[in-house]
């Protein structure tokens, strides 16, 4: 066999490579990029003018869509209360915080008051009540005026009427008539005649007080002046004053009546 020379083998290898590359041109990426870029640069430099780089305008950013998509709104942010608070100015937030603090303070005060009222309304322990009930109540001693009041209630069940003020002469007449004949001029008869309670007649008869002659004379003058004044007033009007039944009673007339009754018998 013939030995192939190195030149012949090199030419064969190069021919095979050319054939293979001509049918399927396999060029490296770098070579292809460089070739394309060079051709593009040449074509651009020749056919189209050079473009200078300029910064993008603000309109581009305003018209362009945001790169980051907006976050989804939560339920709290979508609520009307959140929107109203977001639209409020900053001063209103401070006022709202103050009002919230005031509401909290008022709520705490009201709760404290209610707790105090509940404590005050809580009934006391039954021990104190049982101790008070167990102690026997001693009979309270009555004072003298209370004893007298009870006695007067028994004596006057209908109530106490004020004493009728009588003329001093009538008082003397009552005493004198009772001394003359106690059976006829008894206490009920004198009370009915002078329109006074029986107790008042009893006290008049029991009393032994008598005025001095000077006091009696002054009293008579005063009562005489009073009688004349009343009579003059009534006479001016044209009315005759009414005289009670005991006005005609006097010691002499009483004695005369007694004598007549005795003589007739």
From Swiss-Prot:
One annotated Gene Ontology cellular component of this protein: nucleus
Transit peptide: 1-68
Superkingdom of this protein's organism: Eukaryota
Basic and acidic residues compositional bias, start-end: 95-106, 131-143
Keyword terms of this UniProt record: Mitochondrion, Transit peptide
Region (Disordered): 69-167
Subcellular location: Mitochondrion
Main location: mitochondrion
Database matches in Pfam families: Neugrin
Record keyword Phosphoprotein present: no
UniProt feature, compositional bias: Polar residues: 72-87
Family label: Belongs to the RRG9 family.
Described function: Required for respiratory activity and maintenance and expression of the mitochondrial genome.
PANTHER family: NEUGRIN
Protein name per Swiss-Prot or TrEMBL: Required for respiratory growth protein 9, mitochondrial
């Amino acid at each position: 066999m013939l030995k192939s020379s190195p030149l012949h083998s090199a030419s064969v290898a190069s021919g095979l490579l050319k054939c293979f590359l001509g049918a399927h041109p396999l060029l490296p990426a770098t070579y292809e990029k460089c070739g394309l870029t060079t051709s593009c640069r040449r074509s651009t430099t020749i056919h189209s003018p050079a473009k200078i780089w300029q910064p993008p305008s603000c309109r581009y950013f305003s018209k362009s869509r945001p790169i980051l998509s907006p976050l989804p709104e939560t339920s709290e942010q979508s609520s009307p209360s959140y929107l109203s608070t977001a639209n409020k100015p900053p001063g209103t937030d401070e006022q709202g915080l103050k009002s919230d603090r005031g509401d909290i303070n008022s709520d705490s005060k009201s709760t404290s008051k209610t707790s105090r009222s509940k404590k005050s309304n809580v009934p006391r322990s039954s021990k104190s009540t049982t101790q008070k009930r167990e102690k026997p109540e001693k009979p309270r001693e009555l004072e003298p005026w209370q004893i007298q009041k009870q006695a007067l209630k028994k004596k006057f069940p209908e109530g106490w009427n004020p004493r009728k003020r009588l003329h001093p002469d009538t008082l003397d007449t009552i005493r004198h008539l009772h001394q003359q004949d106690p059976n006829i001029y008894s206490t009920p008869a004198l009370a009915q005649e002078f329109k006074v309670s029986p107790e008042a007649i009893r006290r008049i008869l029991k009393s032994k007080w008598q005025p001095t002659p000077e006091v009696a004379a002054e009293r008579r003058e005063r009562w005489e002046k009073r009688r004349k004044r009343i009579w003059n007033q009534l006479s001016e009007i044209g009315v005759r004053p009414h005289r009670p039944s005991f006005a005609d009673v006097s010691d002499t007339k009483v004695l005369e009546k007694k004598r007549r009754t005795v003589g007739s018998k």
